[in-house]
């Protein structure tokens, strides 16, 4: 393992490996990523992989727009399938307040250049035949949205980062992070230490532990969610047998759930 680097990224999930890739793409090829186990072994392996273009912030919306475009470009660059499926994303509104929020967002989306369609209950039914529209006011739909496979995306990022000169060390546990007298960082691991200019924590569930190494108390805790996989519905099987398009990602913010085809 190298003993000096411009930047050390801690955490081998999709966020960490994406960070390493983009550093290398900007010319910071003297960067290294440290992962305590294997890539995607934290939260990434079971993430839903949704690509929500929806965001009320103009700047964050630009990042989302970039990401959806970039994932397709990454496939071409690395030759690795990231599981990108442009199936659209439909957000349901069962209250007028929620529908007003979506209509306000459409103004932001139009400014960013993100395509958004406003759907009536009947149009929702046309897109998603299994949806009960009885209590719905409407919805918005992002035709360019969809989902990716997070583990596949991470491996594509890793290949792209390595191709650009960056290094990845798996099965490497970070023990401490300290400031040196010459104002660099010393990252101590169970395989030795690395001196670097910058440390980027992308440690997910371990963010609080990593923060304490530099004297920060990060109010971050893991939250358990429910993940349900159902048997295949006859209508969905029929659609697949007929080679019809995959149904879009469906979201209900008021009921706090989302779903997509597996």
Predicted feature locations:
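Residues forming the Rossmann-fold NAD(P)(H) cofactor-binding site
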Residues: 17, 155, 208
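Glycine-rich FAD pyrophosphate-binding loop
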Residues: 24-45
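Dinucleotide-binding Rossmann-like beta1-alpha1 core, especially the glycine-rich loop
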Residues: 49-127, 247, 254-259
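Conserved phosphate-binding and hydrolysis motifs of nucleotide-dependent enzymes
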Residues: 11-16, 191, 202-204
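Active-site acidic short loop of glycosyltransferases
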Residues: 4-5, 189, 196-197
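Beta1/beta-strand and adjacent pyrophosphate-binding region of the FAD-binding site
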Residues: 1-15, 32
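Active-site substrate-recognition segment that forms the wall
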Residues: 21-25, 49-51, 73, 80-88, ...
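Flavin (FAD/FMN) cofactor-binding and adjacent substrate-gating region
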Residues: 73, 85, 94-170, 175-183, ...
């Amino acid at each position: 393992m190298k003993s000096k680097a411009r930047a050390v990224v801690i955490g081998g999930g999709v966020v960490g490996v994406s960070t390493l890739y983009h550093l290398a793409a900007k010319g910071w090829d003297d960067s290294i990523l440290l992962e305590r186990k294997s890539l995607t072994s934290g939260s990434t392996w079971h993430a839903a992989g949704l690509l929500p273009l929806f965001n009320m912030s103009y700047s964050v919306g630009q990042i989302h727009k970039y990401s959806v475009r970039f994932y397709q470009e990454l496939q071409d660059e690395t030759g690795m399938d990231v599981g990108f499926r442009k199936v659209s994303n439909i957000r349901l509104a069962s209250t007028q307040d929620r529908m007003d929020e979506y209509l306000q967002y459409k103004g932001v989306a139009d400014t960013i250049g993100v395509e958004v369609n406003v759907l009536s209950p009947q149009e929702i039914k046309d897109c998603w035949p299994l949806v009960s529209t009885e209590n719905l006011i409407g919805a918005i739909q992002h035709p360019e949205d969809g989902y990716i496979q997070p583990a596949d995306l991470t491996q594509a990022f890793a290949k792209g980062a390595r191709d650009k000169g960056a290094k990845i060390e798996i099965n490497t546990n970070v023990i401490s992070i300290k400031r040196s007298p010459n104002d660099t960082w010393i990252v101590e691991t169970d395989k030795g230490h690395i001196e670097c200019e910058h440390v980027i924590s992308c440690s997910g569930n371990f963010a609080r532990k990593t923060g304490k190494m530099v004297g920060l108390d990060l109010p971050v805790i893991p939250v358990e969610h429910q993940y349900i996989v159902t048997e295949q519905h006859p209508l969905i099987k029929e659609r697949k047998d007929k080679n019809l398009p995959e149904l879009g990602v469906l979201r209900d913010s008021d009921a706090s759930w989302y779903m997509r085809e597996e």
